Design a protein with these regions (language model features):
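Short aromatic/hydrophobic "clamp" motif used to bind/position activated sugar donors
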Residues: 101
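Short, well-formed alpha-helical segments that are part of the catalytic scaffolds
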Residues: 15-28
Length: 200
């Protein structure tokens, strides 16, 4: 397999109804570079793992599946679910070989077939910045009605400093692409840090 330029890291837990749409939206991306899709399941009780394995079998050069350790039928309070999500994202992050990384939740999908190409082009053009990321507007989508609604106020096209970003702007985690800090020997996941839909 060619060295991937972008690694898409996807976490799943009991999301079998969404697996196909999520992965199809990623694999339908139109890029002039290779990608890798790393999927982790956190002990789903439905057939999420079986569906993921089917995609891995169809696209062995692109899709890899990791099944996390779990106790069958284990009840997970919210704080445990967040810690597990951190562990999953950390595991996938350590496996990622791409120059750039995107996170995607297992029940979300890309709507723009050029999302990865557009964001990679922006990051490629900004070679002087070590810790650059870029994001875009996101929306809620209701399958039952086909209606959408912006997650937050629309983002205008602009460049922001870290201070500006953290002071007022929310960009959904799934809308971000950022440089693979691990390739720079930096670990952004400090143990014990609570992460809940934050930048990292």
């Amino acid at each position: 397999m060619a060295q991937p330029k972008v690694s898409i890291l996807i976490s799943f837990y009991n999301l079998a109804p969404y697996v196909d749409e999520t992965l199809q939206s990623v694999l339908n991306q139109k890029t002039d570079f290779p990608i890798e899709v790393l999927c982790a399941d956190d002990g789903s009780a439905d057939n999420t793992v079986e569906k993921l394995r089917q995609w891995e079998k169809r696209y062995p050069e692109t899709v890899r599946v990791f099944v996390m350790d779990f106790i069958p039928g284990e009840k997970r309070p919210p704080d445990v679910r967040i810690k597990r999500l951190n562990a999953i994202r950390n595991r996938l992050f350590r496996e990622a070989q791409g120059t750039y990384i995107c996170y995607l939740d297992g029940d979300d999908f890309y709507t723009d077939p050029y999302k990865l190409q557009k964001q990679a082009d922006i990051l490629d053009a900004d070679t002087e910045k070590k810790y650059v990321a870029c994001g875009h507007n996101g929306c809620f989508y209701w399958q039952s009605t086909g209606k959408t609604r912006p997650i937050e106020k629309p983002i205008r096209e602009c460049s922001l400093t870290a201070k500006e970003y953290w002071s007022f702007l929310y960009i959904h985690t799934n809308a971000l692409m950022f440089r693979n800090l691990r390739l720079q020997e930096i670990d952004p996941f400090a143990s014990g840090v609570t992460i809940d839909d934050n930048l990292l």
